[in-house]
Amino acid sequence: MTVSYWQDASGDRTIECDVCVVGAGVVGLYLARLIAGQGRSVVVLEARHVAAGATGRNAGMVLTGSAYYYHQAVATYGRELAHQLWRLSLHNRDIVKGLSQEFGTLWIENGSLLLALDDTEAEDLTRAYDAMCDDDIQCKITYKDPLKRGFTAVVEQPGDAGIHPVKFCEAMSRSMGAQLFEQSEVHAIEPLPGGGVELRSRRVTVRCGMAALCTNAYAPLLHPYFESKVVPTRGQVLRTEPLGTMLFGQMCYCDYGYEYFRQLPDTSILLGGWRHHFREAEVGYEDRVTADIQGGLEGFLLKYFPEAANLRVTHRWSGTMGFSMDGIPLVGSLPDMPNVYFAVGFTGHGLGFGLATAERLAAHMLFGRDLEWLDAHRLEAQQSTTP
């Protein structure tokens, strides 16, 4: 981003701290909490407000697994890495559950359903189930639709849950032990003599020993390192008025994850997806909904939930996700500023991986623990081996 001379108030106040975290979504807030818990002074800079980005614009579904069905993850990453990704998401779910209970915020643990739209997807779900069983992952498959909506196969995953992501993050921001500056978009990051870092934002300048960028899709706007590594990708969602009847309680994920839905405690239906029908149009930072995708979502809703035919759609919104090149989060530090760290590129699964990834980054920043397969340098290695 750029900031004019007239808009720049960063020189009006300067703060010094041990660590500055950029981004007050679920990753940045939890990272700040972890680092502050180790006795370090922490400042969080947020461009808008807590959970303003993808964290507060998703479906609030805490799911295990990656963007792929499990057998596809095994084929793509190899069995060992696919299983490590699964374990990371399982650990992440445990973290979110514990914090939700600590905060007293919403935690609806009714499990999740992977739903097949047709026989081809049913075959893939069977393969996914077999691969999950091979790795002792708890799940169940059935070829009878428990929702009675015409889905042809269902993999049930116990323990997955739904949250209210904004209230969750607001509660964390109040208890994280760090100083938060909202409406403080960062427009410059520069090294200081002696090894520190200076971050200039709209409201304040922060000088610190280390910084961490937890801005996901917006990382390329902060540093060119991310331009070829993180792709801003828009997702769209709608929410109906309450139906008056609870039809199902699980978090639902179908059409290979391209549609996802849940029924909220007030019986309204939240539905997102349809992006794959308009891939090229759904890239970039523009916050808007489109008639094509919203129409597709409404058609899906009426096909599978005709009870919603007379319900008014109360909310339509979009959110910008940060897609990594390989679908795995990117963690590391900037080549030109090694004390500026980052955790970005969650590929639509920030609630599934974000907190556990922040935990890995905190251990790396404070104790030098190896990032292993989360290390963003893997992309350079992949590029060097590409013919």
Model-assigned labels for residue ranges:
Residues V155-G209:
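Helical element adjacent to the flavin cofactor pocket in flavoenzyme catalytic cores
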Residues M1-V19:
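Extreme N-terminal leader/targeting segments of oxidoreductases
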Residues V19-V44:
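N-terminal Rossmann-like FAD-binding beta1-loop-alpha1 element of flavoenzymes
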Residues I189-I269:
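Flavin-dependent oxidoreductases
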